[in-house]
Amino acid sequence: MESSAKRKMDPDNPDEGPSSKVPRPETPVTKATTFLQTMLRKEVNSQLSLGDPLFPELAEESLKTFEQVTEDCNENPEKDVLAELGDILAQAVNHAGIDSSSTGPTLTTHSCSVSSAPLNKPTPTSVAVTNTPLPGASATPELSPRKKPRKTTRPFKVIIKPPVPPAPIMLPLIKQEDIKPEPDFTIQYRNKIIDTAGCIVISDSEEEQGEEVETRGATASSPSTGSGTPRVTSPTHPLSQMNHPPLPDPLGRPDEDSSSSSSSSCSSASDSESESEEMKCSSGGGASVTSSHHGRGGFGGAASSSLLSCGHQSSGGASTGPRKKKSKRISELDNEKVRNIMKDKNTPFCTPNVQTRRGRVKIDEVSRMFRNTNRSLEYKNLPFTIPSMHQVLDEAIKACKTMQVNNKGIQIIYTRNHEVKSEVDAVRCRLGTMCNLALSTPFLMEHTMPVTHPPEVAQRTADACNEGVKAAWSLKELHTHQLCPRSSDYRNMIIHAATPVDLLGALNLCLPLMQKFPKQVMVRIFSTNQGGFMLPIYETAAKAYAVGQFEQPTETPPEDLDTLSLAIEAAIQDLRNKSQ
């Protein structure tokens, strides 16, 4: 059935006016949609009226159920639609603006039910729709008109439910009187129980000196405070009855049996320097200092609070805390300077009134050079006379002729130039692969204030040296100063060899540095007393070198065949002579 070119105005649906567009041909689905919308509109109008004179009253006889409409097919102009309504009804419901898949589970009173089962007694309102706005039309893939309709002869039932917001979760009301603090967490102070979550006790009076404050810690669910009391005890817990190993007390407190001496003085806190830095307690006053110590809980992992009470007590009992193990971290090179050690010992430094400026410092400006500063004396080139390579090599050869070089060594001094340092590090790597060598780590030199001794001091020293050892030992010439020592920025390294072979081998690696950087690198030979080697493991190699020069080689070269044959003939001739 095709409609005309212009669609006429529908009196039941005034929102749709005449359109000049050519409408699409009506399908059974669109016809069923129009039929359902008409039925729903009447029902909505009947519910909205509710005796209101602004809405027209509808007689109950004009309202018919879906079953009555299907039976009265002759009066219904859409009887051709009702004949195959069983297959199209679900699609018409979607086109009518109702999507059953998007609706949530709601009560039955808020649903629209359409059933083909016969009713015993017709009711005036068999279709109930609330005034909830209907969702937009949607077509799911299962209800698409392109799919083949399902064949069924059974009576069907379609339940259409409008969307409603999800029901909130009802929680039981909790009265304020029912909220009580946990009974496991209590604080006892002066034989009184205080129902609070935590307590900070600061005593300044002599009457409260030596009194005991106990805090019974709660389980993991109880809140932890920033401060605590001298004793923290956990309540009875089912897990605490298990045979667990005793946990160490982080504060070193005694057990509950010996709680009489829990409040002790800090007179024995000097056993550990690290502990004395953290707790500074006065011996004359009776003040107790509170400090927070957070630890791990026994089973729940909750942080426990404790209070450290420090004060003088007449009983004399004292409980020492645990000694904290000092760190074995290797200090930096700057922390090992003499200047830093003197500052740690509170050595006073004189602060000269000089003008600090960049540039070279004259020799007579001693106070400016040794002012109290952390900067080093910087040198682009080495500030002393550098010997030549021939002098260094000649000194090494003289030492090697004696066959013992345990009193000789090689000293390398170089500036902190990046290029120089890279070359020196490469030589250090090669020296590390050689045998019988003792290498030092590059170190700095610190310098003190220069002073010129008067002639009488020089005379006393010379006389003591001429008299002998006893006079030199008794000589006390200590001249001190109050200026700050300064370190130079050039590095020093010492190489000690066990045999002349190793001394010359190390020197052959170091002399090219001196040749490449004549003003930044210096190599020289120094002498020591007969103190031996850096380790006694090199003594065997040194003795073997000295003995090896006087021993004959163990392997003799093989004799020629001619010489061997002549020897055999000579031996035969000797035997003949003896036989005669």
Swiss-Prot record:
Residues 216-236, 259-271, 302-317 have a biased composition (Low complexity). Residues 1-30, 99-161, 206-335 are annotated as: Disordered. Keywords: Activator, DNA-binding, Early protein, G0/G1 host cell cycle checkpoint dysregulation by virus, G1/S host cell cycle checkpoint dysregulation by virus, Host nucleus, Host-virus interaction, Isopeptide bond, Metal-binding, Modulation of host cell cycle by virus, Phosphoprotein, Transcription, Transcription regulation, Ubl conjugation. Residues 1-11 have a biased composition (Basic and acidic residues). InterPro entries: Cytomega_IE1/IE2, Herpes_IE2_3. GO terms for molecular function: DNA binding; metal ion binding. The SUMO-interacting motif (SIM) is required for efficient transactivation function. Interacts with host SUMO-modified form of TATA-binding protein (TBP)-associated factor 12/TAF12 in a SIM-dependent manner; this interaction increases the transactivation activity of IE2. Interacts with host CHAF1A. Interacts with several components of the host transcriptional machinery including TBP, TF2B and CREB1. Interacts with host DNA replication licensing factor MCM3. Interacts with host PLSCR1; this interaction inhibits IE2 transactivating activity. This is Viral transcription factor IE2. It comes from Human cytomegalovirus (strain AD169).
